[in-house]
């Protein structure tokens, strides 16, 4: 989304959004700035639908997710909240601390993401967690020496490349200090009344007194499932003592289906969106909006630059709002859109917008390009021939959104160019 598109879309959305125009704090007025508040009104039905449709398009979603019985206190959502907080720390260094950057409180018993996972996160655009779908936990049977797990990867976004995948299972403390070998297998083929064909994926050594989350690398298996969904027959776990004897996973402290909600086993996968797919999505979105509003833009080009608050403030106050191009407050609330049931965080974010005059002479703080300076000068000499430059974003930052999909899986996605960091004349 280029700067001109952002400039044009914000005024349209501004009158529809449930927003507040205010100064950074109620007791602070910025130099040469005049902010006004107005009585907020409830969105009409068609306004809400238009806003929801547009934001869903920006978020890359074809429809509003309707998760079945989403639960934020389970292990997978808690882990994803921890990753979300890690991303927010980086975003807070890139922009002013705002409402959208509030960290999410976590269950104290839940371990933090490892350095390796933070490394995966730094190179990923999307992170998805998957809950275990196996209902009958084999560990409930006294003589069972294996656990089975199944994960549904059918909702992977088109065009996303899986860069890393992990299987995580919690181990409680047990009162012995024996050493065990935990092995994860990919189920290749099931057989009636026989053991399935298995392929060893990863293994690690544990001690009885060890406590915490065990992580296994299943990247190759995850890629195989994404490319060949019909081969997704799940994982199988087994435990052996050092003398090669099978051991019930429950006896070494491994938590299964009947364990606490915040210690349930799950899978997490990291994805990178290909540049080709990203350009295709942007092209389709921009084409739709250009067709819908080409006529409106043409009419607007023939009008003098209008302040974003025209129609909101009375004429007597509007004359004070004629100011130089700069950044203004704009807050988008997901809660006001009725999305609090599927968006975990943030509840909203400060998007900001650019507005103001790009009139001759352009001051240094207007972040004007050389082209804009020349265009302003020509407009000053001959206003009928060349229009004024536009006030538009010169720097945009991203945000991260944590949400449930239709299957109640938790997704953490990074979205670029969502927050105006600086404005200038272009």
From Swiss-Prot:
Which residues does the record list as glycosylated?
177, 307, 367
* SMART domains from the UniProt entry: TGFB
| GO cellular component terms, A-Z | extracellular space
Q: What is its main location?
A: secreted
Under the heading InterPro entries, the entry gives: Cystine-knot_cytokine (IPR029034), TGF-b_C (IPR001839), TGF-b_propeptide (IPR001111), TGF-beta-rel (IPR015615), TGFb_CS (IPR017948)
Propeptide feature: residues: 23-282
**In which compartments does the protein localize?**
Secreted
Q: Does the record bear Glycoprotein in its keywords?
A: yes
User: Cystine bridges: which residues?
Assistant: 325-391, 354-423, 358-425
Q: What does the record give under GO molecular function?
A: cytokine activity; growth factor activity
The source's superkingdom equals Eukaryota
Any one GO biological process: BMP signaling pathway
Q: How does it assemble?
A: Homodimer; disulfide-linked. Interacts with twsg1.
Any idea what this protein is called? Bone morphogenetic protein 7
């Amino acid at each position: 989304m280029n700067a001109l598109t952002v400039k044009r879309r914000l005024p349209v959305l501004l009158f529809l959004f449930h927003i507040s125009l205010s100064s950074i704090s109620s007791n602070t007025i910025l130099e040469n700035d005049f902010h006004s508040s107005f009585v907020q009104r409830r969105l009409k039905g068609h306004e809400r639908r238009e806003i929801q449709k547009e934001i869903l398009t920006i978020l890359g979603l074809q429809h509003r997710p309707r998760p079945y019985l989403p639960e934020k206190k389970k292990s997978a959502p808690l882990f994803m909240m921890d990753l979300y907080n890690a991303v927010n720390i980086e975003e807070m260094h890139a922009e002013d601390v705002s409402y959208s950057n509030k960290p999410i409180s976590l269950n104290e018993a839940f371990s933090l993401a490892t350095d390796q996972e933070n490394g995966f996160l730094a190179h990923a655009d999307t992170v998805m967690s998957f809950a275990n779908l196996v209902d009958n936990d084999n560990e409930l049977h006294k003589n069972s020496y294996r656990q089975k797990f199944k994960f549904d990867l059918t909702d992977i976004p088109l065009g996303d490349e899986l860069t890393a995948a992990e299987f995580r299972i919690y181990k409680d403390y047990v009162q012995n200090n024996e050493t065990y070998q935990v092995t994860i297998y990919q189920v290749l083929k099931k057989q009636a009344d026989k053991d399935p064909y298995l392929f060893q994926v990863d293994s690690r050594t544990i001690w009885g007194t060890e406590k915490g989350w065990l992580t296994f690398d299943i990247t190759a298996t995850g890629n195989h499932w994404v490319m060949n969904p019909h081969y997704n027959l799940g994982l199988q776990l087994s435990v052996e003592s050092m003398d090669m004897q099978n051991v019930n996973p429950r006896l070494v402290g491994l938590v299964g289906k009947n364990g606490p909600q915040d210690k349930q086993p799950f899978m997490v996968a990291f994805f990178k969106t290909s540049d080709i797919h990203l350009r295709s999505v942007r092209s389709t979105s921009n084409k739709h909006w250009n067709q819908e509003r080409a006529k409106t833009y043409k009419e607007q080009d023939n009008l003098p630059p209008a302040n974003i608050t025209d129609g909101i403030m009375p004429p007597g106050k509007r004359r004070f709002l004629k100011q130089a191009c700069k950044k203004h407050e704009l807050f988008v609330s997901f809660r006001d859109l009725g999305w609090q049931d599927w968006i975990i965080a943030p509840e909203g974010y400060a998007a900001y917008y650019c507005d103001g005059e790009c009139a001759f002479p352009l001051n240094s703080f207007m972040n004007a390009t050389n082209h804009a300076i020349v265009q302003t000068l020509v407009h000053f000499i001959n206003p009928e021939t060349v229009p004024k430059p536009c006030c538009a974003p010169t720097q945009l930052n991203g945000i991260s959104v944590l949400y449930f999909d239709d299957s109640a899986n938790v997704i953490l996605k990074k979205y670029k160019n969502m927050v105006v960091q600086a404005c200038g004349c272009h």
